[in-house]
UniProtKB/Swiss-Prot annotation:
Taxonomic path: Bacteria, Pseudomonadati, Pseudomonadota, Betaproteobacteria, Neisseriales
Region called Repeat 2, residue ranges: 83-146
Protein name: Chaperone protein ClpB
One record GO biological process: protein refolding
Organism annotation: Neisseria meningitidis serogroup A / serotype 4A (strain DSM 15465 / Z2491)
Keywords assigned: ATP-binding, Chaperone, Coiled coil, Cytoplasm, Nucleotide-binding, Repeat, Stress response
Residue ranges of domain Clp R in the record: 3-146
Function description: Part of a stress-induced multi-chaperone system, it is involved in the recovery of the cell from heat-induced damage, in cooperation with DnaK, DnaJ and GrpE. Acts before DnaK, in the processing of protein aggregates. Protein binding stimulates the ATPase activity; ATP hydrolysis unfolds the denatured protein aggregates, which probably helps expose new hydrophobic binding sites on the surface of ClpB-bound aggregates, contributing to the solubilization and refolding of denatured protein aggregates by DnaK.
Length: 859
């Protein structure tokens, strides 16, 4: 016989059999080695074919191994091993069988048929296990499905559905899919399209995370439960694994062969199989090399004829980018748009998933946590979609509580660390012999004993709580498993088993769960509990705060006091601007108490006043107050935006322009730090068109960047500073605040458009500074110098008379507080730098600055 007529799979089996024979020191290549090679290869299909024929495969494997072990061994065997006479006879019978069946190639299943016809040892083993010529022939016909072997790789194309798909209906039967709540309209529309005669292929289109794949899982569950029209009952829903199709397709045409195998299997199934292709846009161009067809083009004829019942899922952007471009592919699909669910629908979805997450994490998820997850994710996580982002919050909060539960509680950890510290101290003190050391040793022993007792008590409580909690979690898991078995029994029509499970097993487990919950409640008072065993709204708020940097959690007493005393804190840095400080403080208090409009920024202000009076300093103080750091101050110098086209730098260049990928300075900063103070400095110097983009920010708290993404400004404070009208403020001095503001507003109305002024929460006019204000600012600035000197182990003391001289030197009604900085530099810092370099001051010494007439002297 010609070996080139053997299929690739059988050639591989012969090579493997030769290796087995060499390893066994056999003198010939026996048929038994080939049978073992075929049975050991998972992809050969030999074991499956024998099982299909009703043969006891484990018995065959066991007897075959015994037979091979009993074969005579020849030591020193080298080179190729020749086939035995029996094997040659089997191969000749295979050739005859292939010719009889009209095959161009000899497939490995014919080896099993020929072996049964022979009377050698391997053939006898098969016959004893139940193999006959008739049942092997019938099994071959069933596996081939009426097709001939006309290709060396024909065996690889068999069972293509098993290799390249995942059975979603089977997963639904096994209870491995999450429950799908709602989405009835979309599922009904998909079923409607699937029932069409031709082009019965729905494609689910929606934003990422809205639940497209969940709709298909919902359809699988409905098919399993028989809640679909007659034409869809008992159908299988398979997920195509495109990655498995492409993986390992080394040679040209191999990918097409695999896909053709899948399509042939589907055609043979006579419409009883639905295929789901997630991320269907990946079909366009998949497997395309020079001159080859891509998967999309190969599927078109089957889709058009209605042979392929396909459900696709993709996002709006990818549908537009890939599928709409190919009009012939697009017309074969029917669009089913999947929108984002509302907050109410998301709450219902989360309630449906609650039990699955409780079982996975082994903790309880409260209803307030579910409501908080839906509402907070909708408000604060703006770049993603419901229900995905709400599910993420629940999952992460539960994961955090589980992690705390499985690690040592904080109270025990503190005692543990203290014990380590005391034992180290004890080891050192024991070496000393004086009375003080002995006394200290007694105290250490006493403290160690006390802490060990406390630790043992806490450990006992912790273990008891953990045991109760783990027990309750285990019972929940068992309840879930019983519910799945009840559903399976109902589907199979075994009502006796279903009622036994429901009224005996389930009731018993429910009683156990109730008892475990009571034990958990009674075991310790809430105040003494070491373990957190449930997820509440506060835990969800903590996760949102960590993800976004926005303080969402309930205000602690400390923060309430801080907000009530906000003016006092800001006045430590900003001197003499009572109206401005009050306006900013009121805006922050409104937002943190939840009274502010949630669709607008926390506050938007226009600060007007002469240079150096504290406009920018107030913004820095505000950022420091809110975030304990000035890093959250986004400062934009508007003098850099004098040209009309400079607006692109704020929101990002439009498509087609250089820098499109980089994004805008303002939008990118706010996306990274959504809770910020935005300072638009010297706003009057910018081009008037730049203000047009600020209109929607001030009104709706949102801005669309160059890439079409919506950036959320609802958690920002927007401050614009300007010198407009500063000449009036200087002329009128500290008169009636409202009169000064009225005059300044006339200038503002000339420069800014009415729609801009109308959207600003408050226009705040800053006063010019008087001598007393400058003296207070001098104190603040000298404190900064004191801190810098402290790092060098030096102290600074400035007398009141010296402070008066500095304030007088730094006072200029036109330039505000900025000349003061220069005065401190020239009068104190310059001479002090020389003295330090000369080594006039030793470490730990005090530098006293005193008045000497109109000059300063250092002592």
């Amino acid at each position: 016989m010609r070996y080139d007529k053997l299929t690739a799979k059988f050639q591989q089996a012969l090579a493997e059999a030769q290796s087995l024979a060499l390893a066994a020191d056999s003198s010939y290549l026996e048929a038994g080695f080939v049978l073992k090679a075929l049975l050991d290869d998972q992809n050969s299909g030999a074991a499956a074919l024998l099982a299909h024929a009703g043969v006891n495969v484990p018995q065959v494997k066991q007897r075959l191994q015994q037979h091979l072990n009993s074969l005579p061994k020849v030591s020193g065997q080298g080179g190729d091993i020749l086939p035995s006479r029996e094997l040659q006879a089997v191969l000749n019978l295979m050739d005859k069988a292939a010719t009889k069946r009209g095959d161009a190639y000899i497939a490995s299943e014919l080896f099993l048929l020929a072996l049964v016809q022979q009377n050698d040892a391997a053939g006898k083993i098969l016959k004893e296990a139940g193999a006959t010529e008739q049942n092997i022939n019938a099994a071959i016909d069933a596996v081939r499905g009426g097709q001939n072997v006309n290709d060396a790789n024909a065996e690889d194309q068999r069972d293509a559905l098993k290799k390249y798909t995942l059975d979603l209906t089977q997963r639904a039967r096994d209870g491995k899919l999450d429950p799908v709540i709602g989405r009835d309209d979309e599922i009904r529309r998909a079923i409607q399209v699937l029932q069409r005669r031709t082009k019965n292929n729905p494609v689910l289109i929606g934003e990422p995370g809205v639940g497209k794949t969940a709709i298909v899982e919902g359809l699988a569950q409905r098919i399993v439960n028989g809640e679909v029209p007659e034409s869809l009952r008992n159908k299988r829903l398979l997920v195509l694994d495109l990655a498995a199709l492409i993986a390992g397709a080394k040679y040209r045409g191999e990918f097409e062969e695999r896909l053709k195998g899948v399509l042939n299997d589907l055609a043979k199934d006579d419409g009883n199989t639905l295929i789901f292709i997630d991320e269907i846009h990946t079909l366009v161009g998949a497997g395309k090399t020079d001159g080859a067809m891509d998967a999309g083009n190969m599927l078109k004829p089957a889709l058009a004829r209605g042979e392929l019942h396909c459900i696709g899922a993709t996002t709006l952007d990818e549908y537009r980018q890939y599928i709409e471009k190919d009009a012939a592919l697009e017309r074969r699909f029917q669009k089913v748009l999947v929108g984002e669910p509302s907050v109410e629908d998301t709450i219902a979805i989360l309630r449906g998933l609650q039990e699955r997450y409780e079982i996975h994490h082994g903790i309880d998820i409260t209803d307030p946590a579910i409501v908080a997850a839906a509402e907070l994710s909708d408000r604060y996580i703006t770049d993603r979609f419901l229900p995905d982002k709400a599910i993420d919050l629940i999952d992460e909060a539960a994961s955090r509580v589980k992690m705390e539960k499985e690690t040592k509680p904080e109270a025990m950890d503190k005692i543990d660390r203290r014990l380590i510290q005391l034992r180290m101290e004890k080891a050192h003190v024991e070496k000393e012999k004086d009375d003080a050391s002995k006394k200290r040793l007694e105290l250490i022993d006493e403290e160690i004993n006390g802490l060990q007792k406390e630790y043992a008590d806490l450990d006992e409580i912790w273990k008891a709580e953990k045991a109760i909690s783990d027990g309750a979690a285990n019972i929940k898991k068992q309840i879930d498993e019983v519910k799945i078995k009840i559903e399976q029994a109902k589907r199979q029509g075994d009502l006796a088993l279903a009622s036994k499970l429901m009224y005996e097993d389930l009731e018993h487990l429910e009683k156990q769960r109730a008892a475990a919950e009571r034990a958990d409640t009674d075991s310790t008072k809430p105040a003494n509990k070491l373990l957190r065993n449930n997820v509440g709204a506060e835990e969800i708020a903590e996760v949102v705060s960590r993800m976004t940097g926005i303080p969402v959690s309930k205000m602690m007493e400390g923060e309430r006091d801080k907000l009530l005393k906000m003016e006092e804190v800001l006045h430590r840095r900003v001197v003499g601007q009572d109206e401005a400080v009050r306006a900013v403080s009121d805006a922050i208090r409104r937002s943190r108490s939840g009274l502010a409009d949630p669709n607008k920024p926390y506050g938007s202000f226009l600060f007007l006043g002469p240079t150096g009076v504290g406009k920018t300093e107030l913004c820095k103080a505000l950022a420091g107050f809110l975030f304990d750091s000035e890093d959250h101050l986004i400062r934009i110098d508007m003098s850099e935006y004098m040209e009309k086209h400079a607006v692109a730098r704020l929101i990002g260049a439009p498509p087609g322009y250089v820098g499109y990928e980089e994004g805008g300075y303002l939008t990118e900063q706010v996306r990274r730090k959504p809770y910020s103070v935005i300072l638009l400095d010297e706003v009057e110097k910018a081009h008037p068109d730049v203000f047009n983009i600020l209109l929607q920010v001030l009104d709706d708290g949102r801005l669309t960047d160059g890439q079409g993404r919506t950036v959320d400004f609802k958690n920002t404070v927007i401050v614009m500073t300007s010198n407009i009208g500063s000449q009036h403020i200087q002329q009128m001095g500290i008169q009636d605040y409202e009169a000064v503001k009225e005059v300044v507003m006339e200038d503002v109305k000339e420069h800014f458009r009415p729609e801009m002024i109308n959207r600003i929460d408050e226009v705040v006019v800053f006063h010019g500074l008087d001598q007393a204000n400058i003296r207070s600012i001098a104190k603040i600035q000298l404190k900064g110098l004191e801190k810098r000197l402290e790092k060098q182990n030096l102290r600074l003391a400035v007398s009141d008379a010296a402070l008066d001289i500095i304030a007088k030197a730094g006072f200029d009604p036109i330039y505000g507080a900025r000349p003061l900085k220069r005065a401190i530099q020239s009068e104190i810092e310059n001479p002090l730098a020389k003295a330090l370099l000369a080594g006039n001051y030793a470490p730990e010494s005090e530098i006293r600055v005193e008045a000497d007439g109109d000059r300063l002297k250092f002592a």
